[in-house]
């Protein structure tokens, strides 16, 4: 790229895909300079070689965007993240349809709007604790599904328990040992496996809870949020993501 072209670039819109990154570059007046596609492993090197220092690099706040934003900021560029729903109005659906190239152009266009609200770039620590929360939520969903499966099997044998998972968890070992009920042998074995899985999920959730509680003790912002009436450790972590 000629040096004069490099100097003209004021902003680029970047669409991040799994294998290829699409770029749409404009000058200070918003005029298109070029559009191109790069392999992911070429992107940062290309930016350092072809973009002027401080150039705005706008991306949707999607999976992996915070990582790229941190990398770009460290290289001296102005990384901006935009919530996907704020980019949608700028997509030119009638001109070639929705694809990665038009998405990059839409992101570039959205970034220049004076009232645009940008997503704060998260630190690795923030993303780590949010990842922990996501894993815990996954365990929680798995546990709910496991409990429902156990209830479903028991119901087929005429065994019904109160809605409280604690009641079911306390009663299930005795139910499995009770030879007088109608449970078949294979059903008992299957439910024993499900019970062990349930307990394992409880242990994993408790581990996550300990990690979250430790984070709240160590993080002043989370500690302040947790002092608000009605906000516990997990909610205080969620508050900080915004």
Give residue spans per PLM region.
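A detector of single, family-specific signature residues
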Residues: 1-242
């Amino acid at each position: 790229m000629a040096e004069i072209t490099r100097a003209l670039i004021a902003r680029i819109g970047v669409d991040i895909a799994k294998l290829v990154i699409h770029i749409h570059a404009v000058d200070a007046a918003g005029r298109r300079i070029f559009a191109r596609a790069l392999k992911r492993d070429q992107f940062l090197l290309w930016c350092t070689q072809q973009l002027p220092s401080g150039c705005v690099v706008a991306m949707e706040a999607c999976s992996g965007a915070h990582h790229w934003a941190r990398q770009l900021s460290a290289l001296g560029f102005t990384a901006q993240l935009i919530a996907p729903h704020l980019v949608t109005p700028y997509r030119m659906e009638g001109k070639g349809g929705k694809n990665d190239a038009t998405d990059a152009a839409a992101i570039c266009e959205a970034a220049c709007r004076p009232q645009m609200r940008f997503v704060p770039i998260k630190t690795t620590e923030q993303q780590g604790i949010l990842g922990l929360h996501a894993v815990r939520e996954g365990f929680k969903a798995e546990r709910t599904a496991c409990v429902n499966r156990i209830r479903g099997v028991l119901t087929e044998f005429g065994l019904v328990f109160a809605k409280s998972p604690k009641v079911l968890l306390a009663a299930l070992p005795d139910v499995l040992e009770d030879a007088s009920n109608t449970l078949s042998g294979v059903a008992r074995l299957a439910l024993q496996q499900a019970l062990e899985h349930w307990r394992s999920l409880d242990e994993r959730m408790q581990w996550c809870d300990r990690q979250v509680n430790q984070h709240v003790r160590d993080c002043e912002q989370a500690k302040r949020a947790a002092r608000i009436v009605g906000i516990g450790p997990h909610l205080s972590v969620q508050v900080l993501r915004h």
